[in-house]
């Protein structure tokens, strides 16, 4: 085998014995000195201190934030030390109760304890430090304010985050006020319908604002009741003027600093006794505030008197008929409207409004009223009827205006009186007066005034195609046909000869059998000279003619010169009663010829003893 050391002269040199050595291989050095390390190590042996800054460079931070943080920690430690020094423990203060120290600690108990007795007045504070009480009260008030604000935010968020805000408001209303919102109000579909009385519910409003609204709202209303529970309030308001829902929503949203979604507004059930009792009973509680007297609808349902106690809620038609008869109401609309106005003072009228058959009652009342009036008129003679019409007129007039107007139209006044006398007596062939002449001569003027005074009826020939056009003549003492044309005279010549004679005829009535009747005295105006018309010769003997040739005189202001009114005819009949052979007024009878006892269509009632 070959020798590994061949060709190499091996020298064994001992360290220290020779200054030379042969480098056979390179040494492995792990770390080499860099330029920075050389400079850093060069100062290790320096005798000058801090000649070169060897500290590490630090990044510049937020010194102000650090200072505030340190200052806050120092303050908190100082406050904590002060609290520990001044606050007494329950073991050291036996006179103070747990409830006085903290309301929340009262609920945390290990063993059952007896509740402390309520004190009417706070402790005088002798022997205690005033600083302790002030600090405790301030801490408690701040915690309560934070709790209230947090609760208000939660209540508001629960409403606006709800998918059905209406249902949420209704549920909250019933939870706080103990009754459903629909039980107190009647819904208004339109937001522009006006009403004086309103019920307003407010949800999630600040207590301070609700308290301030009790004073602010007084300028807008006559009555105000506020029932408040925390952030919820219920208003019963009677405004000075009727307002709509839109107006009320804007008013309350500005006054209470809430949105319209937090409000509910509807009129109260003004005819519901439970609704009235709810607000009336709540008025005695501490949570209720009242300004002004109760509304009429609430007072009527809650306050009793001797009249309401004795009255019956059942509607009586006879009382309605008596009212219409006493007030001389002659149309259905007039009866319904004026009787409804009595609902505030008359129990029977209130029962009429509550009924679902008002239309039927009005028709029945009108029908019975016509029956009574018709028979009353038939039982009177023409003289009694004229005296009745005179009594109905409360004014005084001058009969000379009638005489002057007839003289102006060249009519003999004595002939006119004789014609009226035979007309009222119903003498055959003297039962119709005809006033004819040129237009605008006052024919219709004098006839209309006499018909109005005697409460007569007017018929028109334009309704001739109906067989019932003469039906109104059955309910009057005097009839009037205005402006009869030539065709009208031809119709009367063919169909009404017996009627003009003053004899009985068969009169067609709607929905009834023909009536045997004698037509009342008639007044007719026309522009046709019937007296000289050859084709109407058979009517001449049945009519009494008065010609008006002159145009009706007027004043400068276009008013009639001879103003003939009901008072003028009243004075005329009183003046010429003997000439017309009217029955004199008896001493034992009423002025109108009737008995002093008034007509009564209601059943008599016994007066209850008190």
Curated annotation (Swiss-Prot):
Region (Disordered): 591-610
PTM info: Phosphorylated. Sumoylated.
EC number(s) reported in the record: 5.6.2.4
Catalytic activity entry: Couples ATP hydrolysis with the unwinding of duplex DNA by translocating in the 3'-5' direction; ATP + H2O = ADP + phosphate + H(+)
UniProt motif Nuclear export signal: location: 101-110
Enzyme class: isomerase
Record motif Nuclear localization signal, residues: 83-85
GO-annotated biological processes: DNA replication
Family recorded in the similarity comment: Belongs to the papillomaviridae E1 protein family.
Protein name in the entry: Replication protein E1
Organism expressing this protein natively: Human papillomavirus type 60
Lineage: Viruses, Monodnaviria, Shotokuvirae, Cossaviricota, Papovaviricetes
């Amino acid at each position: 085998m070959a020798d590994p050391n061949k060709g190499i002269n091996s020298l064994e040199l001992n360290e220290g014995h020779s200054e030379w050595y042969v480098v056979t291989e390179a040494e492995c050095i792990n770390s080499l000195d860099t330029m920075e390390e050389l400079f850093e190590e060069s100062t290790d042996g320096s005798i000058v201190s801090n000649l070169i800054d060897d500290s590490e460079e630090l990044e510049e931070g937020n010194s102000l934030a650090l200072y505030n943080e340190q200052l806050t920690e120092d303050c908190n430690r100082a406050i904590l030390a002060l609290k520990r020094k001044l606050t007494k423990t329950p073991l050291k203060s036996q006179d103070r109760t747990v409830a006085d120290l903290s309301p929340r600690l009262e609920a945390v108990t290990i063993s059952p304890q007896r509740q402390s007795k309520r004190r009417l007045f706070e402790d005088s504070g002798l022997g205690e430090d005033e600083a302790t009480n002030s600090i405790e009260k301030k801490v408690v008030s701040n915690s309560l304010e934070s709790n209230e604000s947090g609760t208000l935010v939660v209540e508001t968020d629960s409403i606006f985050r709800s998918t059905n805000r209406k249902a949420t408001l209704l549920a909250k209303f019933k939870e706080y006020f103990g009754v459903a919102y629909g039980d107190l109000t009647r819904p208004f579909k339109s937001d522009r319908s006006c009403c004086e009385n309103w019920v307003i519910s407010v949800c999630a409003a600040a207590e301070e604002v609700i308290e301030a609204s009790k004073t602010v709202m007084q300028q807008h209303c006559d009555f105000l009741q506020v029932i408040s529970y925390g952030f919820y309030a219920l208003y019963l308001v009677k405004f000075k003027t009727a307002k709509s829902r839109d107006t009320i929503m804007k008013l309350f949203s500005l006054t209470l600093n809430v949105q319209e979604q937090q409000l509910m507004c509807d009129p109260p059930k003004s005819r519901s006794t439970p609704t009235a009792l709810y607000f009336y009973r709540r008025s005695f509680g501490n949570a209720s505030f009242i300004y002004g007297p109760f509304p009429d609808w609430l007072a009527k349902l809650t306050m009793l008197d001797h009249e309401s106690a004795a009255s019956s809620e059942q509607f009586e038609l006879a009382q309605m008929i008596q009212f219409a008869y006493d007030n001389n109401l002659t149309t259905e609309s007039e009866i319904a409207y004026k009787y409804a106005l009595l609902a505030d003072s008359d129990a029977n009228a209130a029962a009429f409004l509550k009924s679902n058959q008002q239309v039927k009652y009005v028709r029945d009342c009108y029908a019975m009223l016509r029956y009574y009036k018709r028979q009353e008129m038939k039982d009177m003679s023409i003289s009694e009827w004229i005296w009745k019409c005179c009594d109905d007129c409360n004014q005084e007039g001058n009969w000379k205006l009638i005489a002057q107007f007839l003289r102006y139209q060249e009519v003999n006044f004595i002939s006119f009186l004789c014609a009226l006398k035979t007309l009222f007596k119903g003498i055959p062939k003297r039962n119709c007066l005809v006033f004819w002449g040129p237009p605008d001569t006052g024919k219709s003027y004098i006839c209309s005034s006499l018909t109005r005074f005697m409460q007569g009826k007017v018929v028109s020939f334009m309704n001739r195609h109906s067989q019932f056009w003469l039906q109104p003549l059955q309910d009057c003492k005097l009839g009037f046909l205005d402006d009869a044309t030539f065709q009208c005279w031809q119709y009367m010549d063919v169909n009404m000869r017996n009627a003009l004679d003053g004899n009985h005829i068969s009169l067609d009535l709607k929905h009834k059998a023909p009536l045997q009747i004698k037509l009342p005295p008639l007044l007719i105006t026309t522009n046709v000279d019937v007296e000289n018309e050859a084709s109407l010769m058979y009517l001449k003997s049945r009519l009494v003619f008065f010609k008006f040739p002159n145009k009706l005189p007027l004043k400068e202001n276009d008013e009639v010169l001879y103003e003939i009114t009901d008072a003028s005819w009243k004075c005329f009949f009183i003046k010429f009663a003997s000439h017309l052979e009217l029955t004199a007024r008896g001493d034992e009878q009423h002025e109108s010829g009737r008995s002093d006892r008034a007509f009564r269509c209601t059943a008599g009632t016994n007066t209850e003893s008190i």
